[in-house]
Amino acid sequence: MDVSQFLNNVENDDTLQNIRKEYLNSKRTLQELMTNQSPTKKMEFSKKPTLLQERNSNDYINRNVNSSKPTDDEFLRRQLREGLSRKPEPKISLPSLASDTNRLDSIYSSVNKIDELEKKLYHHELQIQALKNELYQSNASNRALQNKVAELQDSVRMLAALSHSNVKADTDNSQLSANGKWTRHYAGPNSNGNGVYLDRPQSAPSTSSTSEWVANALHDSDDTRVLLGWKQPSSTRVDNSSNFHFPHNQPRNLSNFDDNTSRLIGVTGKTRN
């Protein structure tokens, strides 16, 4: 005989079957009790206090020892005590609509004020920048004017120094002329600035007249260049100042020239007919 068949046989081993039957019977009876129990008793059974709570509560001390089940009055009293012992929940108060509108209006007004202040601040910054630019331009113009004033002062000093030197030279010349030592002449193109000609003799030659000496003195430089071969002789020209005619191709006496001119002619080796 197989083992499984032997174990499943009720006659041979009824332990498992008996356990199953007892479990099902107990489950059925429990369901019947739960369905037959009232709602208040269900709540009381679910909220049954522990042993420690029962010892600490006044209900445990004052309850009737003889009564095996709590009555409905005791259950109501317990609920009343528990409700009084609990702290009330805080009430949430919602703001009213008027307060919200007032708050929004205040926020908008403050924002508008901030915008206006920012605009004013920006405008003031622009004004400050414009004033800075004007100050910079005025400083630059002042510096330019100061430079011009300094230049004018320098030029005035130079003019004063020149005028002082000219006045001093005039006084010296006047003193010399008064003493009869020196006479001021016309400073021509061949003069050294002191009335002394560089390319003519210092005194009139004795072999010619005074008029010839004056005419030769005015044109000594040109005649010297012709004699040295530096310039071609030109046609006869007229001096308007003295009204004399000077033919440059006319032979000229060497006595009209100073020693330096004679030396230059001798060095060049050229002869004059």
From Swiss-Prot:
GO molecular function, one term: structural constituent of cytoskeleton
Biological process per Gene Ontology, one example term: spindle pole body duplication
Pfam families: Spc29
InterPro entries referenced in this protein's UniProt entry, alphabetically: Spc29
Ranges for region Disordered: 38-72, 186-212, 234-258
Source superkingdom: Eukaryota
Biased amino acid composition, Polar residues: 53-69, 203-212
Subcellular location: Nucleus; Cytoplasm, Cytoskeleton, Microtubule organizing center, Spindle pole body
Keywords from the UniProt entry: Cytoplasm, Cytoskeleton, Nucleus
Main location class: nucleus
GO cellular component: central plaque of spindle pole body; cytoplasm; nucleus
Family in the record: Belongs to the SPC29 family.
Function: Component of the spindle pole body (SPB) required for the proper execution of spindle pole body (SPB) duplication. Links the central plaque component SPC42 to the inner plaque component SPC110.
Protein name: Spindle pole component 29
Source organism of the structure: Kluyveromyces lactis (strain ATCC 8585 / CBS 2359 / DSM 70799 / NBRC 1267 / NRRL Y-1140 / WM37)
